[in-house]
């Protein structure tokens, strides 16, 4: 199972986190599948690669609590729901994507 979670970077007392897609069995600093963004809690800056996040969420990846909150602020889940609604409407009409 794949999770979207934070990977700690930076130096002592000055943490910066990468948001990564990683296998559940890997440790926090383990090898990730893909980097999908970063989060700086001190400057309160966030960057998300939205297509990559939507790809992993569409494939069944589960975000951790903190990544879920960050994604919620960035309104990622609204985009995911819009994409799912379009796909459902097209499949009902006979189009398969």
Curated annotation (Swiss-Prot):
GO cellular component labels: chloroplast; mitochondrion; small ribosomal subunit
Cellular location(s): Plastid, Chloroplast
Domain of life where this protein originates: Eukaryota
Key words of the record: Chloroplast, Plastid, Ribonucleoprotein, Ribosomal protein
One GO molecular-function entry: structural constituent of ribosome
Biological process annotations from GO: mitochondrial translation
Xref: Pfam families: Ribosomal_S16
Main location: plastid
Family: Belongs to the bacterial ribosomal protein bS16 family.
HAMAP family according to UniProt: Ribosomal_bS16 (MF_00385)
Entry-linked PANTHER family: 30S RIBOSOMAL PROTEIN S16, SMALL RIBOSOMAL SUBUNIT PROTEIN BS16M
Protein name: Small ribosomal subunit protein bS16c
Lineage of producing organism: Eukaryota, Viridiplantae, Streptophyta, Embryophyta, Tracheophyta
């Amino acid at each position: 199972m794949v999770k979207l979670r934070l990977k700690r970077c930076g130096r002592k007392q000055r943490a910066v986190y990468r948001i990564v897609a990683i296998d559940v069995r890997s440790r926090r600093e383990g090898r990730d599948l893909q980097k999908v963004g970063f989060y700086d809690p001190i400057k309160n800056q966030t960057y998300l690669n939205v297509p990559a996040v939507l790809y992993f969420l569409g494939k069944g990846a589960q975000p951790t609590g903190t990544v879920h909150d960050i994604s919620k602020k960035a309104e990622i889940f609204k985009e995911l729901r819009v994409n799912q609604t379009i796909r459902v409407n097209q499949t009902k009409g006979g189009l398969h994507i």
